[in-house]
Amino acid sequence: MIGPHDRALRERAARVIPGGLWGHQRAASLPEGYPQFFRGGEGCRVEDVDGRTYVDLMCSWGPIVLGHRHPAVEAAAQAQRALGDCLDGPGEVLVDLAETLVGMVEHADWAMFQKNGTDATTACVMIARAATGRRKVLVARGSYHGSAPWCTPVPAGTTDADRQHLIAFDYNDPDSLAAAVAQAGDDLAAIIVTALRHDLARDQELATPAFAQAARALSAERGAVLIVDDVRAGFRLDLRGSWAPLGIEPDLSAFSKAIANGHALAAVTGREGLREAASRVFVTGSFWCSAVSMAAALATLRELRRIDAPAVMAGAGQRLRDGLAVQATHAGVGLRQSGPPQMPLLLFEGDVEHRLGALFCREALARGAYLHPKHNMFLCAAHDDAAIDAVLAATEPALAAVARALREG
């Protein structure tokens, strides 16, 4: 049920903002009855503008990795804010952060910073083209790399020319990738691939060792650049980079979401051989040297390493996954859980239009758990046992409601 304050804000927004909001957080993309506007957050919980509190399993769609308003992160941000944020050049923290990131990410010899994931993936593509002098970029069908004209999933406002040098392949299919490489011929600049397959409304897939090895080998054979888009998964799965457990080192990686625990920042890391090309491309923005977000990122990365946050999140996510599996079996509902436990996706068998997913999420929301019916969710390090148990207390009757809907047709 949409609260009165939220409803009033939607009406006001509709008068002054096209569509009421832009992008993936607009109300039309949410289940009916979901709040659009929020007042604040603390730890693993958020409060909407009507004062209702939820255990948050979206974590601001990924940026919250330690928990909302994490004390160490906010203290670092406030200390830098007292000195200044946007100055005539970057603060000392820029170098501190770059050194920390290079020391953490396995393949990294250098780092550059931006504001959003799209900034980072676009910079990676530009660096690859500058380094190779070539144009073609291979992308997986259905993958999301941002909202710039070359990669946005919605074609409004773009032209065919924006994508004329992209060639598609199928994720986790080495043969499809090899065919795309052959199609690019001598004009292959880069292969860009998400750390895992996390397309909207389909089961997630971790990259297979065979696929990752093929991407690495084919890039090397053709003198092309292998880019891992780690914007969504970075620092949740592995602090060294999400493909480190596979033994694969990309040439470039793009990071954003979890890097600064909700403060606006993105990063590109790269190997030594691309340093010169990276220095030649012109990428910049009015707020790209903002010192406050960099101070927050430095504190975030240190805390992630101190507590081994990926393991903490994996444990919480597995507790949730195991509990949901038991509940779904008891309810007699076909629930598919996919992806790493830190980034769970829940889909129902036969639910092509996601009506069961929307019903499930509405019922859980009414009981204090904020989930999503077709987008992967995100765990953070603040999700303790009590929070996961609270989610499971909400999902059990929600699954029962799904079972009733199935029986009633």
Feature-to-residue mapping (PLM):
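Conserved N-terminal phosphate-binding loop of PLP-dependent enzymes in the Aspartate aminotransferase
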Residues: M1-G409
